[in-house]
C-alpha cells in the first residue's frame, strides 16, 4: 500500500517536471541577453565632442569671403554712368520743369518756421530750475540738527556725587530735638540733617544756613543747678530704698 503511494508520488513529480520543461515560450536565459547593451554609448559621446572643436575654424573662412565681396561696387559705379540718358534729360529740363522749380525756390519761407521751432525748443531754462530744486540748504540743516550741545550738557551734568563736600555744623543744637531736660554743652560736630540735597561741582558750598540748623546761644542753655542735683540724688536713694 505504501509502496504504491510512493510510486504515484514519483510519477506525479516527473510529470510536473516534464510539463515545465516542454512549456512553449518559457526560457530561463532571458536575463543574460540584456546585460551588454549600455557599453557603446560612451564611445558616441567622445566622437561628437571632438568634432565640435573644429567649428571655430569655419568662422574665419566666412569673414574672408565678406572682404572679397568689396570689389563689386567698382562695377556698379560703371553701371551708374549711363552716358546715353543725359542727352534726353537735357531736352526735358529745357521745357516746363525749370519754371516750376523757380516757384519752388521762392517758397523758401518754411525755414522761418524752422527757426521758430528751434527757439521753442529753448526750454533749457526748466533744466536750470531742476538743478536748483536739489536744495542743498536742507542738507545743511540736517547736519546742524545733530545738536552736540545736548551731548555737552549730559557730560557736564554727570559729576553730581559730591555729598562728601558738605560741611558738618559744629557746636550747635536742633530746636526740635531737645524740648525738656538738660543740654549737654560738650556736644560738638552735629551731623547734617538734609543729606539728600546734591550740589554740582561747579557751585562752591558757602551758605551753611541752608541746612535748617539753628545754633542755640549760650544764654539759652540750661545748666544743672545744685538744688536740682540734690533732688535727683534724693530720688535715686528713695528708689533704691523702696526696691530693697
UniProtKB/Swiss-Prot annotation:
Record lineage: Eukaryota, Fungi, Dikarya, Ascomycota, Taphrinomycotina
Organism the protein comes from: Schizosaccharomyces pombe (strain 972 / ATCC 24843) (Fission yeast)
The name this protein goes by in its record: Uncharacterized protein P19A11.02c
Compartments, as annotated in UniProt: Endoplasmic reticulum membrane
Keywords: Endoplasmic reticulum, Membrane, Signal, Transmembrane, Transmembrane helix
Main localisation: endoplasmic reticulum
Transmembrane segments: 224-244
Gene Ontology CC annotation, any one: endoplasmic reticulum membrane
Region (Disordered), start-end ranges: 55-128
Compositionally biased residues, Low complexity: 55-65, 75-128
Signal peptide, first to last residue: 1-18
Lumenal side, ranges: 19-223
Topology in membrane: Single-pass type I membrane protein
Amino acid at each position: 500500500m505504501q509502496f504504491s503511494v510512493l510510486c504515484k508520488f514519483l510519477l506525479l513529480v516527473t510529470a510536473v517536471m516534464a510539463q515545465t520543461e516542454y512549456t512553449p515560450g518559457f526560457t530561463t536565459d532571458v536575463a543574460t541577453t540584456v546585460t551588454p547593451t549600455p557599453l557603446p554609448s560612451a564611445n558616441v559621446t567622445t566622437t561628437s565632442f571632438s568634432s565640435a572643436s573644429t567649428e571655430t575654424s569655419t568662422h574665419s573662412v566666412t569673414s574672408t569671403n565678406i572682404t572679397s565681396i568689396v570689389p563689386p561696387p567698382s562695377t556698379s559705379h560703371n553701371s551708374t554712368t549711363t552716358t546715353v540718358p543725359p542727352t534726353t534729360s537735357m531736352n526735358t529740363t529745357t521745357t516746363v520743369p525749370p519754371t516750376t522749380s523757380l516757384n519752388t525756390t521762392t517758397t523758401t519761407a518754411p525755414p522761418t518756421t524752422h527757426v521758430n521751432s528751434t527757439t521753442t525748443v529753448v526750454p533749457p531754462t526748466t533744466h536750470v530750475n531742476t538743478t536748483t530744486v536739489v536744495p542743498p540748504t536742507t542738507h545743511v540743516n540736517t547736519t546742524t540738527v545733530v545738536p552736540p550741545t545736548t551731548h555737552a550738557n549730559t557730560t557736564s551734568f554727570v559729576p553730581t556725587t559730591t555729598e562728601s563736600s558738605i560741611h558738618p555744623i559744629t557746636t550747635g543744637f536742633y530746636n526740635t530735638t531737645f524740648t525738656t531736660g538738660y543740654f549737654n554743652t560738650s556736644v560738638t560736630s552735629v551731623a547734617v540733617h538734609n543729606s539728600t540735597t546734591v550740589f554740582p561741582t561747579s557751585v562752591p558750598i558757602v551758605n551753611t544756613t541752608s541746612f535748617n540748623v539753628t545754633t542755640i546761644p549760650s544764654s539759652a542753655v540750661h545748666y544743672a543747678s545744685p538744688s536740682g542735683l540734690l533732688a535727683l540724688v534724693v530720688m535715686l536713694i528713695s528708689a533704691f530704698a523702696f526696691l530693697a
